[in-house]
Swiss-Prot record:
Expressed in brain, heart, kidney and thymus. Also expressed at lower levels in liver, skeletal muscle, small intestine and spleen. This is Protein phosphatase Slingshot homolog 1. Its main location: cytoplasm. Keywords: Acetylation, Actin-binding, Cytoplasm, Cytoskeleton, Hydrolase, Phosphoprotein, Protein phosphatase. Residues 13-22, 697-712, 917-935 have a biased composition (Low complexity). The gene is Ssh1. Residues 1-12, 675-693, 886-900, 985-995 have a biased composition (Polar residues). The active site is at C393. It comes from Mus musculus. The keyword Acetylation applies. SMART domains: DSPc. SUPFAM superfamilies: (Phosphotyrosine protein) phosphatases II, DEK C-terminal domain. Protein phosphatase which regulates actin filament dynamics. Dephosphorylates and activates the actin binding/depolymerizing factor cofilin, which subsequently binds to actin filaments and stimulates their disassembly. Inhibitory phosphorylation of cofilin is mediated by LIMK1, which may also be dephosphorylated and inactivated by this protein. The modification N-acetylalanine is found at A2. Pfam families: DEK_C, DSPc, PH_SSH1-like_1st.
Amino acid sequence: MALVTLQRSPTPSAASSSASNSELEAGSDEERKLNLSLSESFFMVKGAALFLQQGNSPQGQRSLQHPHKHAGDLPQHLQVMINLLRCEDRIKLAVRLESVWTDRVRYMVVVYTSGRQDTEENILLGVDFSSKESKSCTIGMVLRLWSDTKIHLDGDGGFSVSTAGRMHIFKPVSVQAMWSALQVLHKACEVARRHNYFPGGVALIWATYYESCISSEQSCINEWNAMQDLESTRPDSPALFVDKPTEGERTERLIKAKLRSIMMSQDLENVTSKEIRNELEKQMNCNLKEFKEFIDNEMLLILGQMDKPSLIFDHLYLGSEWNASNLEELQGSGVDYILNVTREIDNFFPGLFAYHNIRVYDEETTDLLAHWNEAYHFINKAKRNHSKCLVHCKMGVSRSASTVIAYAMKEFGWPLEKAYNYVKQKRSITRPNAGFMRQLSEYEGILDASKQRHNKLWRQQPTDDTIAEPSEFLPETLDGALDAQLPCLDDTTHPGLPRSLAPGGPALPCCFRRLSDPLLLPHHDETGGLVHLEDLEKDALLEEEESQPVEVHKLVQHPQEGARLCEKDVKRKLEFGNSKPRSDSLPQVEELEKDGSPRTGRWRRASTQLDRSLLDQENLNNNNSKRSCPDDLERDAMFGILSKVKPPYTSCADCMYPTAGGTPEAYMERHEDPSSSAICTQPTFLPHVTSSPMAHASSRSRAPERPASGPANTSPFLLPAGSRKPDVSGSGAGAAPEPPASLLEPSRETSKALPKSLQLKNPHCDKNAANMEVSAKEEPSPKKDPKPAKDLRLLFSNEAEKPTTNSYLMQHQESIIQLQKAGLVRKHTKELERLKSLPSDSPAACRDSATCRLEASIPEEGSQEPAHPALCSQAGSEEQPVGGTLQKSPTSTLPRLDHTSNFSKDFLKTVCYTPTSSSISSNLTRSSSSDSIHSVRGKPGLVKQRAQEIETRLRLAGLTVSSPLKRSHSLAKLGSLNFSTEDLSSEADTSTIADSQDAKCGLSSSFLPEPQSAPRDPAATSKSSGKSAPEHLKSPSRVNKS
């Protein structure tokens, strides 16, 4: 296969042509001169040359002195034949034919010109060369193609052309040459029929010039005129198979199957149809003379299928060299990009199309895999430009087909088998050689490894075989993926709940899987591998059912679900909340937790039906209760979860430190933008909204004034990491246990003004408040009370002046969220409540009923009683049941408060300083501000704090400095966790409980109309905050019990 460009030159026939056609217009001289300078490019196969409709494109010109090495002597013969023509005539096709004389070379040439009415007129010329090295040729036959021209296959490797009573038989030297001749002749006959060319008319008069030029030897002329009596020079079928019987239909079916296999394995440029038939007879072991016509027709059918490019995708064609040379077809199909996967085939139209060459041969040892990446980008370039790309090799069977299969595997994430079957279905002759199949298998492993690195680390494992496009994981498209992630949404009894978890389904154990496990396999039971949750939850179920107040049973239709609301949360959080394995004892917890982190807070626009399903699933998977697991397991889970690395999403600094002059409505609009790309995976606490627990309390004090809030007054939540999905839309009665009104009211009030990431201070509040949103929407909506929003604006302006004081409280409250994942939130919350109940500088704020209910806004694993006994009487007297659904018991938490006194502030300091995935800790090493480096109010800067965190974590995990340092460097590649030189050398820090006490007092004062509290002495605060128990770090048993 070659592309050869020849230059037209003046010929002796030009003068005679001009004299014999003096009736032509005067402008024909200019046209003739233009034709003399035109280059003519030909698409060449062995035995045939097809003119390319390229005109005088300068990019396509080539020098004849350097013919293509695969073109043979055809370019020289073609140049001689061009010089034989008139200047206005063109060669459309030249096909080499067999001859009875071994030293002679014969060509059937299709010559065309533009007629009087700019119509195409075609004739056939028989051209003879005395030898292969001859520099001259003669014309031995001229055949006009009239409108009655008919073409038939002779069944012996040739075809006959009959017109106006004359018939000639032509036998091309190869199947490919015959196929090219048949296509060109078919189009020429169509033109003759359309314009009704008939003998005696004005058409084809110019053929008389060539008839006058017939000058071949008489033996050659006789050969052209006696073609109907010419026997093929090929040997007949072997006599061995002459007497074998045949069975019609059965034989035809075998012929179809074997003929396709033979043609796909043969070089059609170097074999004839007779040779293919002989090979077919050998394989079928029978004589096929009576099936010659059937074989030729099937051969043409197969050639037609191989000739037509196959549309694999909307932007991708797979074809052969013939398709790459068919300009009309390329332009008609909208192809602008051509990927040439051959070494022996040229680019035919370099001035018209964008080409990319992969110069390889079709051999098993060829390294095609190295080129698939560049081929992928080239094809996608055509896709991005809304165009189409043709990928071709010689036949469109092996090299180009392998490239298209590799493209499908990478573009759509398909396995090799699926991609191969898909391309095979679109183009049935697809058959990569054995070497390319091995490379495709290797390429599949490379792509799988790449998915493990880049996709599966931060993505939930898909539950089906659908292709996961990158856009499916954006916030805008996650709603559309809801049906795929929740297979049983249309289950009316338990919507959104997998069958294995539904009450009627099989009771499969819920396990955690390793990062290397491709599927969730319940039957795996290796040591340290799978952690079954059933035993961890039985005690929690019993304990929660016993401790639940009687009044709550009045509210919840199904008493058992009140405990399940909290019970299943551990499973959900451990399954979807964490990021990295901390130790070998619990690798699955962090691996499954990291899958959920990127998706936190992205389910804002789900429909009512889907959210009702999600709500039921959430209620069946909530578990904040205590876990009866071994002490070492709980400790490892605690410190493994707290040390997880956050995926590198957009920083939450904008959420944490916006401008102080912004209004609550401005923050509301900014956080509710569904197209926003900044997704906070952790709850962020603005400096001027750190008093949101007080805002909760103030709204709770107004609960009797406003019994319920309609859906218009609520807004979606952005849940913290550890929460799975927010439940915003309403659900039917009884779909989920309705939470107590003490949590319902604050969520209603604050959701209107606060950003979604600031409304709730721990995951348990998130769950309950989200459920209360649902129940709130079922109630009628009274007139909105504008007073809470006004107070909140006051809070915004007051607290904007104390970012330093409240930053430590932010860290403390974020640690609550992380501790709750490990099942330690009860003790930590009690300690915080006990600290907040100590005397403060603002008694007026404490006397306010809102302050008295501050602790109640931090609930305790499903129990709705007040947290501190000193505030119970006032809370119980002022807070009336809403709709008769809630009554508080002021004494139910006294035993639990005594239990939490074992925890010292040093231990809480250790936990509080344990690194979390908040935006503060993740940005420490990248911060160069004075707040991060220098001390603030006698306390070390954030960099020193982080050094303290890292050293504390290493000591409690029983590790040396070098071992986690190496591990952290590997984690840094994925989670942007960078170590500085100060990370490993830090002095002991003071207790952070004093910080939280300072922040608490600042909160109380900020609730007043004017900021009245002056900065307090940190030393004095430390004294008032109570004891310091360094022995807590020395006592691992007490840590284990926590």
